[in-house]
């Protein structure tokens, strides 16, 4: 039977490759005239590529040994040509990776690391991504030790495939084998973080920056730009500003898109004065002419603080400078009008937008809908939809995602599912944001069984699961105390090449702590530290609060001490939980000592602080002290809330009852 008939259908296009010369043919003919038949080899590899790792060469089957001997005369360039052909399609790509160890075992071509690096480079040049399954299953190198060339090639492929966890492991291997990572390694890793939908994880960025400084590599302007962009997207404008200053100190100017990202981050943090100063320094006072995106970043800040006058002035200045506003510009202004309750002004702006030749898209209407959502006016979602249809604009995936989120936030799960069904009826495929929003809404609405059903439907739809998806499910399973499910979900997340972020670890600490599984909660913090990540104040607060709920004041105090040992200052929120822990344990003196500590360290007690102290006093029946604390709260400028007033009434009622008795 011909060898080509043994090949799977997906590999038949490769059967025409070079043929072996017939017996008796002169071997002195030019290589280009020589033909080699690779059909038997491809057929053999197609049946063995899914098998476990092959045995050492000394115990290889006779078939493979004979097959290898028949290809001993094939020159290196022909192996390269075959690899390129196999890498040309996703169907035959696994076969290309099966060929590499075959060549290595029989020493048929030069070092495997170089071959693999060449293959990865070919994929990169063609703009194709290395399949995730291959990234996870293929070893970093089939040689020992691995070469830095191969590790960097795999790192770049992992980054291109948006698999930062795999890229991080490869960076760790570089350091483990005492190879000095180059700037490209960090650039590739930052690219993988910036190419994801979610903001980069702050702890991961800190770890990367620390590693870069430890390696004593001097970042160039592109790497500084990537670092600034990453920290800005992670909502860490102070770190981004520090990096900007470091770049300027050595005479480097970051790319304009990095500066724009930083202006946007400052605006989002309501630090508009700093955003203005940066805009003036780099764009108006500098040699770089501001583009639409830079103006939009500044405009975003004005919208955030509700400064409509300044927002409108930005549009005027753009017109004077000859910079055309785009859809995002108008969207931000429409958003500002909607948030200010000026729906008619928003409608007028939509007409101006069309007059300027910028047709409003679904995104503009999604911003209007988001404005109503944030103002609590979810019922106006239907009016926005009507206005859309009147303007001849069809809802897209993003609009439906905002609509589902709007209904989900106000527990209108029926409307959310209707929007989801309508979306699919219109041929719009839900993405990871759609599924996450819908699953999370059902979790928060207490519909856990339905949330799990939706998660299963998401899997069946082949929609890729993201870190946020796993975080939602870990929280759900933790609330139901399904601990095996929690561990399985975390393991699956890592197997998919996703990096557990600060939210993942905080969720784990919270669900373990609230269930009294304190050992597991502490283990999570230690595991995070072992991974080189820094626990956040939120994580420590979750653990302090968990101990407080069970009256374990000493344990809560130890967590606060550990927090300070890690260089984190305890916030008012954390110390309020510590006061609650002492109160639950009936240790009033210690509870008031925390109040004194707050005053001495410049932390302003809030209404929760005083309410928690009043609750502690009532618990130990020191009712007469409650009015004193209530008076101190008012004197300090804290407005009593309903709970504080209820505490006072309760104490006064007990005091009156005791006097009567």
Curated annotation (Swiss-Prot):
GO cellular component: chloroplast; cytoplasm
Major subcellular location class: plastid
PPR repeats: 147-181, 182-219, 220-254, 255-290, 291-325, 326-360, 361-395, 396-430, 431-465, 466-500, 501-535, 536-570, 571-605, 606-640
Disulfide feature: none
A Pfam family the protein falls into: PPR_3
Targeting signal (transit peptide) range: 1-57
Top-level taxonomic group: Eukaryota
BP GO terms, sorted: mRNA processing; regulation of translation
PANTHER family, alphabetized: OS03G0856100 PROTEIN, PENTATRICOPEPTIDE REPEAT-CONTAINING PROTEIN
Function of the molecule: Required for the processing and translation of chloroplast mRNAs.
Molecular function via GO: mRNA binding
Compartments, as annotated in UniProt: Plastid, Chloroplast
Similarity field: Belongs to the PPR family. P subfamily.
Record keywords, A-Z: Chloroplast, mRNA processing, Plastid, Repeat, Transit peptide, Translation regulation
Protein known as: Pentatricopeptide repeat-containing protein CRP1 homolog, chloroplastic
């Amino acid at each position: 039977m011909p060898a080509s008939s043994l090949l799977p259908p997906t590999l038949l296009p490769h059967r025409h490759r070079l043929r072996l010369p017939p017996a008796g043919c002169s071997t002195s003919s030019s290589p280009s005239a020589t033909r080699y038949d690779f059909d038997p080899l491809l057929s053999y590899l197609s049946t063995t590529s899914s098998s476990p790792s092959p045995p050492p060469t000394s115990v290889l089957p006779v078939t493979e040994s004979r097959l290898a001997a028949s290809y001993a005369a094939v020159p290196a360039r022909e192996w390269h040509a075959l690899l390129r052909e196999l890498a040309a399609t996703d169907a035959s790509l696994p076969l290309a990776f099966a060929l590499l160890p075959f060549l290595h075992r029989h020493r048929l071509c030069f070092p495997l690391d170089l071959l693999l690096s060449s293959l990865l480079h070919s994929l990169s040049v063609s703009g194709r991504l290395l399949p995730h399954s291959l990234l996870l299953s293929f070893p970093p190198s089939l040689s020992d030790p691995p070469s830095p060339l191969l590790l960097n090639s795999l790192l770049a492929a992992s980054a291109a495939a948006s698999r930062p966890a795999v890229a991080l492991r490869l960076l760790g291997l570089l350091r483990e084998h005492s190879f000095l990572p180059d700037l490209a390694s960090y650039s590739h890793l930052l690219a993988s973080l910036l190419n994801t939908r979610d903001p980069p994880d702050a702890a991961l960025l800190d770890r990367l920056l620390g590693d870069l400084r430890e390696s004593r590599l001097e970042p160039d302007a592109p790497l500084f730009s990537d670092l600034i962009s990453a920290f800005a997207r992670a909502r860490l404008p102070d770190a981004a500003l520090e990096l900007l200053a470091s770049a300027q100190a050595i005479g480097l100017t970051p790319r304009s898109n990095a500066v724009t990202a930083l202006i946007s981050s400052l605006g989002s943090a309501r630090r508009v004065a700093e955003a203005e100063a940066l805009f003036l320094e780099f764009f108006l006072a500098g040699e770089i002419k501001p583009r639409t995106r830079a103006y939009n970043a500044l405009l975003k800040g004005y919208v955030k603080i509700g400064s409509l006058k300044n927002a409108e002035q930005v549009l005027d200045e753009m017109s004077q400078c000859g910079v055309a506003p785009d859809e995002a510009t108008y969207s931000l202004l429409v958003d500002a009008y909607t948030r200010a309750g000026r729906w008619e002004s928003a409608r007028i702006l939509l007409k101006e937008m069309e007059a300027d030749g910028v047709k409003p898209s679904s995104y503009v209407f999604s911003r209007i809908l988001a404005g109503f959502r944030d103002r609590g006016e979810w019922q106006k979602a239907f009016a926005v939809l009507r206005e859309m249809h009147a303007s001849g604009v069809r809802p897209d995936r993003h609009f439906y995602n905002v609509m589902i989120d709007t209904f989900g936030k106000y527990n209108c799960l029926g409307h959310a599912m209707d929007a989801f069904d309508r979306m699919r009826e219109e041929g719009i495929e839900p993405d990871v944001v759609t599924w996450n929003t819908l699953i999370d809404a059902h979790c928060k609405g207490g519909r856990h069984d339905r949330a799990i059903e939706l998660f299963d439907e998401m899997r069946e739809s082949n929609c890729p699961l993201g870190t946020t998806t796993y975080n939602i499910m870990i929280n759900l399973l933790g609330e139901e105390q399904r601990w095996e499910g929690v561990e399985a979900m975390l393991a699956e997340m890592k197997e998919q090449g996703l990096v557990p972020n600060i939210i993942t670890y905080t969720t784990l600490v919270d669900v373990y702590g609230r269930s009294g599984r304190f050992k597991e909660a502490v283990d999570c913090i230690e595991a995070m530290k072992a991974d080189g990540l820094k626990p956040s104040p939120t994580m420590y607060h979750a653990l302090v609060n968990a101990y407080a709920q069970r009256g374990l004041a000493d344990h809560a105090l130890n967590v606060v001490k550990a927090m300070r040992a890690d260089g984190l200052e305890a916030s008012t929120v954390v110390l309020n939980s510590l006061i609650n822990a002492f109160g639950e344990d009936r240790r009033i003196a210690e509870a008031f000592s925390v109040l004194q500590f707050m005053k001495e360290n410049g932390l302003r007690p809030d209404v929760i602080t005083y309410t928690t102290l009043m609750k502690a006093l009532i618990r130990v029946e020191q009712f007469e002290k409650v009015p004193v604390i209530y008076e101190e709260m008012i004197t300090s400028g804290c407005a009593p809330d309903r709970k504080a007033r209820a505490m006072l009434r309760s104490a006064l009622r007990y005091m009156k009852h005791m006097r009567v008795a």
